[in-house]
């Protein structure tokens, strides 16, 4: 066992003395040591309940004959960080979490690892750490929040974001927005639709790193406590069997994860995160792999924000095992932490609600929910969640309205300075330019709330999993490094064709070269972590990982 490095031999008497001060007994010195990375805090709704989940994991570890040691990691709530300077810190926190877990695992020589996490950057950060450390590991995701409810319909956080636009449009009063604000979020858990946190939980299960069914179980359901205990027991089995994350994160399992993502119509952020996880596993994964899978994987679940169904509906319909059941003929068989293969899990599943999880013969759409687009505006690629784009906007040509940053764009939107047909360009919001590649949920939600139907938005920043509408993000190269998006001027024609997977700037190359002669990136003064981050972060088409 790895942990023998700190507990065997007379030379380790000082190490053992410290362990004994924790209450570790002679008998326990001979057992596997399991690290439990718990991202609990009381500022993130998705993490508020993780203490109870971690406690059940610890009980499971002990029951299976190992010793649990809990440690903490940070976690940022993207919703609370949204729309201000705080959002610049969200994506960088992914790398911080991965590094922090690695530090604890390697310093203390744990034999196994359980990652207890829920929200947007915490799940991928812990996945990266688990694969990087490559000790037997299992992930327990905290589960979705129950939907809010008012006026006879289910609510989610996106209703509140879009309510801001409705107030600006005069179609909702501030009092009504206040009532919505108080009804939308009834308790702990990740935001209720197929936004980034829940998409990552589903992807983790499809990768084979969570027990079957874990992703969709609501945060407040006792089934979450049971699967947490089972996960604690199972990680001890993985230690004894010698099954490691890199045995599970393979080209086949990554393809399965992308298939599930496409079938669900998941968040565009999964492109960044899966590429980052693949890099830790030394598995080649590029943007074209997402298009290749999307073209042969039907979109079979019409989930919020593009559709009507919440994560609660997905859970009641059978969760990810039922989705795997419908995708069975599209899947590559691959092992999972459960000890059963992905096809065994699919064969044993049942679809309880065919309106929520459709067959591949009667899908929402014949192709997957994400597309990678390229063209003169995005030579190295960009990402669009086509599952949330009305088909009437799959082809669009319009004049650019250019904003150097989200704040200026938001002000113009709320003051109704945008015309139908415009293409909003929000730039200098990429990995280096933001820095931190902030999400543009506030402007996209404001556009929806104001009732704009034919306004597109393109950016080198990111979009929340809650974004809906014709929004293309992750444009690479970004403006800060001189990508074509830096050269766009007001009135330039931008051509979007999602059928052709293209995004073009209808400006002569010679004109762009003239503009480049006078282009300079905006000067800005950065300090602290962000100053270090911009020196090492890669472009979005490489997963925005740090070198």
Swiss-Prot record:
UniProt keyword Transmembrane helix present: no
One example of a Gene Ontology biological process annotation: isoleucine biosynthetic process
Disulphides: none
Record's catalysed reaction(s): (2R)-2,3-dihydroxy-3-methylbutanoate = 3-methyl-2-oxobutanoate + H2O; (2R,3R)-2,3-dihydroxy-3-methylpentanoate = (S)-3-methyl-2-oxopentanoate + H2O
Listed InterPro entries: Dihydro-acid_dehy_C (IPR042096), DihydroxyA_deHydtase (IPR004404), DiOHA_6PGluconate_deHydtase_CS (IPR020558), ILV_EDD_C (IPR056740), ILV_EDD_N (IPR000581), IlvD/EDD_N (IPR037237)
Binding of [2Fe-2S] cluster, residues: 119, 191
EC id: 4.2.1.9
Pathway: Amino-acid biosynthesis; L-isoleucine biosynthesis; L-isoleucine from 2-oxobutanoate: step 3/4; Amino-acid biosynthesis; L-valine biosynthesis; L-valine from pyruvate: step 3/4
Residue(s) carrying N6-carboxylysine: 121
Free-text cofactor note: Binds 1 [2Fe-2S] cluster per subunit. This cluster acts as a Lewis acid cofactor.
Keywords, alphabetical: 2Fe-2S, Amino-acid biosynthesis, Branched-chain amino acid biosynthesis, Iron, Iron-sulfur, Lyase, Magnesium, Metal-binding
Pfam families per UniProt: ILV_EDD_C, ILVD_EDD_N
Recorded GO MF terms: 2 iron, 2 sulfur cluster binding; dihydroxy-acid dehydratase activity; magnesium ion binding
GO CC annotation, single: cytosol
Active site: 464 (proton acceptor)
Binding of Mg(2+), residues: 78, 120-121, 439
Keyword DNA-binding assigned: no
Cofactor(s) this protein requires: [2Fe-2S] cluster; Mg(2+)
Enzyme class: lyase
Subunit details: Homodimer.
Record-stated family: Belongs to the IlvD/Edd family.
PANTHER family in the record: D-XYLONATE DEHYDRATASE (PTHR43661), D-XYLONATE DEHYDRATASE YAGF-RELATED (PTHR43661:SF3)
Function statement: Functions in the biosynthesis of branched-chain amino acids. Catalyzes the dehydration of (2R,3R)-2,3-dihydroxy-3-methylpentanoate (2,3-dihydroxy-3-methylvalerate) into 2-oxo-3-methylpentanoate (2-oxo-3-methylvalerate) and of (2R)-2,3-dihydroxy-3-methylbutanoate (2,3-dihydroxyisovalerate) into 2-oxo-3-methylbutanoate (2-oxoisovalerate), the penultimate precursor to L-isoleucine and L-valine, respectively.
Protein's name according to its UniProt entry: Dihydroxy-acid dehydratase
Organism from which the protein derives: Methanoculleus marisnigri (strain ATCC 35101 / DSM 1498 / JR1)
The organism's taxonomic lineage, starting at the top: Archaea, Methanobacteriati, Methanobacteriota, Stenosarchaea group, Methanomicrobia
UniProt gene name: ilvD
């Amino acid at each position: 066992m790895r942990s023998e490095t700190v507990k065997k031999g007379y030379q380790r008497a000082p190490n053992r003395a410290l362990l004994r001060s924790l209450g570790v007994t002679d008998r326990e010195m001979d057992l596997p040591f399991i690290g439990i990375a718990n991202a609990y805090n009381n500022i993130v709704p998705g993490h508020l309940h993780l203490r109870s989940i971690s406690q059940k994991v610890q009980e499971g570890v002990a029951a299976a004959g190992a010793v649990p040691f809990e440690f903490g990691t940070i976690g940022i709530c993207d919703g609370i960080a949204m729309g201000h300077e705080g959002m610049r810190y969200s994506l960088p926190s992914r790398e911080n979490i991965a590094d922090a877990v690695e530090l604890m695992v390697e310093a203390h020589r744990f034999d196994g690892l359980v990652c207890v996490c829920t929200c947007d950057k915490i799940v991928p950060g812990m996945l990266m750490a688990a694969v990087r450390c490559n000790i037997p590991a299992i992930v327990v995701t905290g589960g979705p929040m129950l939907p809010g409810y008012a006026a006879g319909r289910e609510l989610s956080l996106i209703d509140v974001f879009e309510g801001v636009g409705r107030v600006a449009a005069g179609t909702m009063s501030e009092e009504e927005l206040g009532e919505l604000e108080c009804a939308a979020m009834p308790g702990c858990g990740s935001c209720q639709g197929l936004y980034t946190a829940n998409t990552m939980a589903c992807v983790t299960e499809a990768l084979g790193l969570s027990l079957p069914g874990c992703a969709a179980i609501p945060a407040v359901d006792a089934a979450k406590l049971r699967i947490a205990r089972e996960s604690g027991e199972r990680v001890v089995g993985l230690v004894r069997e010698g099954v490691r994350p890199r045995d599970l994160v393979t080209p086949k399992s990554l393809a399965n994860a992308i298939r599930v993502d496409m079938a669900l119509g998941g968040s565009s952020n999964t492109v960044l995160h899966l590429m980052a996880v693949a890099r830790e596993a030394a598995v080649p994964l590029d943007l074209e792999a997402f298009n290749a899978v999307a073209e042969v994987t039907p979109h079979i679940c019409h989930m919020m924000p593009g559709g009507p169904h919440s994560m609660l509906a997905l859970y009641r319909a059978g969760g990810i095992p039922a989705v795997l059941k419908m995708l069975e003929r599209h899947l590559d068989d691959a092992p999972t932490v459960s000890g059963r293969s992905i096809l065994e899990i699919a064969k044993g599943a049942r679809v309880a609600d065919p309106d929520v999880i459709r067959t591949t013969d009667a899908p929402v759409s014949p192709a997957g929910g994400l597309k990678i687009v390229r063209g003169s505006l995005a030579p190295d690629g960009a990402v669009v969640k086509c599952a949330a784009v009305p088909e009437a906007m799959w082809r669009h040509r319009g004049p650019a309205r250019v904003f150097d940053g989200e704040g200026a764009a938001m002000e113009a939107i709320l003051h109704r300075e945008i015309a139908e047909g415009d293409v909003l360009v929000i730039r200098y919001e990429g990995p280096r330019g933001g820095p931190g590649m902030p999400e543009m949920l506030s402007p996209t939600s404001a556009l929806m709330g104001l009732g704009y139907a034919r306004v597109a938005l393109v950016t080198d920043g990111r979009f929340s999993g809650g974004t809906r509408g014709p929004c293309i993000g992750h444009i690479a190269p970004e403006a800060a490094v001189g990508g074509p998006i830096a050269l766009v001027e007001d009135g330039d024609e931008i051509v979007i064709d999602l059928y052709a997977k293209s995004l073009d700037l209808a400006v002569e190359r010679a004109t762009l070269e003239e503009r480049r002669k006078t282009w300079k990136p905006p000067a800005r003064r950065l300090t602290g972590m962000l100053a270090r981050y911009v020196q090492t972060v890669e472009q979005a088409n490489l997963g925005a990982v740090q070198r």
